[in-house]
Swiss-Prot record:
Its main location: secreted. Its EC number is 3.4.23.1. It comes from the Eukaryota. The lineage of its organism: Eukaryota, Metazoa, Chordata, Craniata, Vertebrata. Disulfide bonds join C106-C111, C267-C271, C310-C343. CDD domains: pepsin_A (cd05478). This is Pepsin A. GO terms for biological process: digestion; proteolysis. Residues 75-384 form the Peptidase A1 domain. GO terms for molecular function: aspartic-type endopeptidase activity. InterPro entries: Aspartic_peptidase_A1, Aspartic_peptidase_AS, Aspartic_peptidase_N, Pepsin_A, PEPTIDASE_A1, Peptidase_aspartic_dom_sf. Inhibited by pepstatin. It holds the Pfam family Asp. Coiled coil: none annotated.
Amino acid sequence: MKWLLLLSLVALSECLYKVSLIKKKSLRKNLIEHGLLKDFLKNNTLDPASKYFPQGEAATMIANQPLVNYLDMEYFGTIGIGTPAQEFTVIFDTGSSNLWVPSIYCSSPACTNHNRFNPQESSTYQATSQTLSIAYGTGSMTGILGYDTVQVGGIADTNQIFGLSETEPGSFLYYSPFDGILGLAYPSISSSGATPVFDNIWNQDLVSQDLFSVYLSSNDQSGSVVMFGGIDSSYYTGSLNWVPVSAEGYWQITVDSITMNGEAIACAEGCQAIVDTGTSLLSGPTSPIANIQSYIGASENSNGEMVVSCSAISSLPDIVFTINGIQYPVPASAYILQDEGGCTSGFQGMNIPTAYGELWILGDVFIRQYFAVFDRANNQVGLAPVA
């Protein structure tokens, strides 16, 4: 029996490629330090809903991915594009599907402060005549699509289509800690029909299992990781509980209920949720979120943050997400974010009109508590408490 267990663990880790994620200061913190956040918030509406289910023409022509919604992101990984590889810091985002980075064709202030891809310095780059447009709150990032080899955690992903930005509106992006985005959602929401990175990796038989997994460390600058092609059981305790994907676009699942102190605070008759590494907070409909903010004593400060008394953490209850019959508690020490500047709420209101009814986003606040496996082969998400 022990040998069988050992063999199964070996099989799970076979062809497992890891990308280390580094925890950095968020764009919000950078803007606060430079005295720019108030101007930024005045000119940019912070609307997490705008990332999901774009309506009308935007749904087919544009990847609706306002970068204002990455304001609080802290986890970033490094990839290489081209031959020889040019390095970029990206967000590994399960809430979008395109890969894009700044290019030398972009002269916007945001691009000048970041790594820019130079096609002329890559012997494997192939140009196309296709264009890419990604909507921001204040305009669009426009660019072109090309093909090249992308190095991801030791995988050489050849002939990968990606976006090269030509314009990036908004001087605030000058201070962003990332260069671009690597989307890990389904191909159905990819702009311009571009094949997502993980799909291309799987199609080339570069990994042994059609899945990837994510571990986010709560405290350390390092230790967080995205794993392609396998599962490392040392990152979680107990067994993985599997949840069917309810709609193949985002990593969307059905939630049975959301409770605090045993009472339903939202989702009493079930609701939908998207497991999104590219969203830092727990987002939900504005009405129940407002009730939660009131319950935990959160109030808005001049920086638009919902501030909470740090001393309240020990007395506040867990918020419990029941998913596929299993309870997933998130303690106050996780949903209240602490740093040297004090304590802020990890909840954020948004309204998304969808055919699925009430929608929640389980962002990094949730994923720091639960190791997540994104299983494309079986269209399911695996969750287990982090080790």
